[in-house]
Amino acid sequence: MVRVFITGSSDGLGRMAAQLLVEQGHGVVLHARNERRGQEALAAVPGAETVVIGDLMSIAQTRGVADQVNRLGLFDAVIHNAGAGYREPRCIATEDGLPHVFAVNTLAPYILTALIQRPKRLIYLSSGLHRSGDASLKDLAWENRPWQGQQAYSDSKLHDVLIAFAVARRWPDVLSNALEPGWVATKTGGPGAPDDLDAAHRTQVWLAVSDAPAATVTVTGWTHIYCWTAMCGLKSCGRLAKPMIGV
């Protein structure tokens, strides 16, 4: 049995991944941003161990999520599934004065990666839109640029890939991977999304628990079990990760 913590698992792909992991006999801890959603998540995934509560828009609450997770003991895998902010028409500021999309998609997985006891595997959900992300890493918090919602989302998804690469460089004993779930019919993707929803959550589950040779590698991009090539290429992503995380 593998023990897995999944952020953003109260609905969507995170909940689907949790349900599949429980069906396979693994231990799962859920995450939701508030108590109401947490209870809904437990009802939807009754085999889960428990649910951790905290809004990833908030730095303080994100740190609180890490504290709650650490009190539950070691995990074999952490899936950074939570995401938000696709095409936000205006910049929504958090209590910390940061853009909502940056706080949830970039800063939260960074903080959780730094604070949660190191698992054997780390999985980061990116997007095909990472290819349009700004690789300069300038103005991460959109303090100087006019707001562009889709660009902000693309930037954040490139950041997720870079975090995965930076972790792989710093922690060679951890399997660190990023994946693209495809354009699927979730709240973010919309009802007209063309890709296979039933396949979208399976890649993160596979990366979390499989002993297949292809799943036990690091700094690789995946979508629906098929390898994809990052916009900047593997060597370039590794280079770009250095200024972002200092490794």
Segments and roles (model prediction):
Residues 83-88, 99, 121-173, 180-193:
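Catalytic loop of short-chain dehydrogenase/reductase
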Residues 1-29:
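Canonical Rossmann dinucleotide-binding motif of NAD(H)/NADP(H)-dependent dehydrogenases/reductases
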Residues 62, 178, 193-240, 246:
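C-terminal helical subdomain
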Residues 56-74:
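Conserved Rossmann-fold cofactor-binding substructure of NAD(P)-dependent oxidoreductases
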Residues 46-47, 68-80, 86-92:
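A glycine-rich helix->loop->beta "capping" turn
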Residues 24-40:
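Conserved glycine-rich Rossmann-like NAD(P)H-binding loop of the short-chain dehydrogenase/reductase
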Residues 45-60:
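Rossmann-fold cofactor-recognition segment
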